Amino acid sequence: MNLQEILKEIDFKKGSDLIPTIIQDFYSGEVLMLAYMNKESLEKTIETNTTWFWSRSREELWNKGATSGHFQYVKSIHIDCDGDTLLIKVEQLGPACHTGHRSCFYTPLI
């Protein structure tokens, strides 16, 4: 599939031009984080083979690892059955969470 065909498969309109994106460790299967992508960040992710996201608080694109060095190298990208959520499997360098934890999901509730 080329980039335009990939973008046609994704329903960006449901989430105000943003889609939730689950980041999972390619090797262990551990869920590392959830972030949001728009078309531009998905295009940059595919072009660079590293994850790019849309920051809802800063309203700007950001490349995971650009500041910390904890890059995420894309191994595969999957779309869900409704076309409105992505699962990206990555090779994670260092911790995924800005707190220094491997995963953003380190706090158990139950």
Swiss-Prot record:
Which PANTHER family has this protein been placed in?
HISTIDINE BIOSYNTHESIS BIFUNCTIONAL PROTEIN (PTHR42945), HISTIDINE BIOSYNTHESIS BIFUNCTIONAL PROTEIN HIS7 (PTHR42945:SF1)
What keyword terms does UniProt attach to this protein?
Answer: Amino-acid biosynthesis, Cytoplasm, Histidine biosynthesis, Hydrolase, Magnesium, Metal-binding, Zinc
Q: Which organism is it from?
A: Clostridium botulinum (strain Kyoto / Type A2)
Which GO cellular component terms, listed alphabetically, does the Swiss-Prot or TrEMBL entry include? Answer: cytoplasm
Instruction: Name it.
Output: Phosphoribosyl-AMP cyclohydrolase
Q: Under which main EC class is this enzyme filed?
A: hydrolase
> Could you tell me which HAMAP family the record lists for this protein?
HisI
Which Enzyme Commission number(s) are on file for it?
Answer: 3.5.4.19
Q: Which family does it belong to?
A: Belongs to the PRA-CH family.
Q: How does it assemble?
A: Homodimer.
Q: Which residues bind Zn(2+)?
A: 81, 97, 104
- Which catalytic reaction applies to this protein? 1-(5-phospho-beta-D-ribosyl)-5'-AMP + H2O = 1-(5-phospho-beta-D-ribosyl)-5-[(5-phospho-beta-D-ribosylamino)methylideneamino]imidazole-4-carboxamide
Needs which cofactor?
Answer: Mg(2+); Zn(2+)
Pfam families from the xrefs?
PRA-CH
Keyword Magnesium attributed: yes
Q: Which domain of life is it from?
A: Bacteria
Does this entry carry the keyword Membrane?
no
Q: What is the lineage of its organism?
A: Bacteria, Bacillati, Bacillota, Clostridia, Eubacteriales
What metabolic or biological pathway is this protein involved in? Amino-acid biosynthesis; L-histidine biosynthesis; L-histidine from 5-phospho-alpha-D-ribose 1-diphosphate: step 3/9
Q: What does the entry list as the binding residues for Mg(2+)?
A: 80, 82, 84
State any single GO MF term.
magnesium ion binding
Say where the protein is mainly found: cytoplasm
List, alphabetically, the InterPro entries matched.
PRA-CH, PRib_AMP_CycHydrolase_dom, PRib_AMP_CycHydrolase_sf
Q: What this chain does, per the record?
A: Catalyzes the hydrolysis of the adenine ring of phosphoribosyl-AMP.
Which BP terms does GO give this entry? L-histidine biosynthetic process
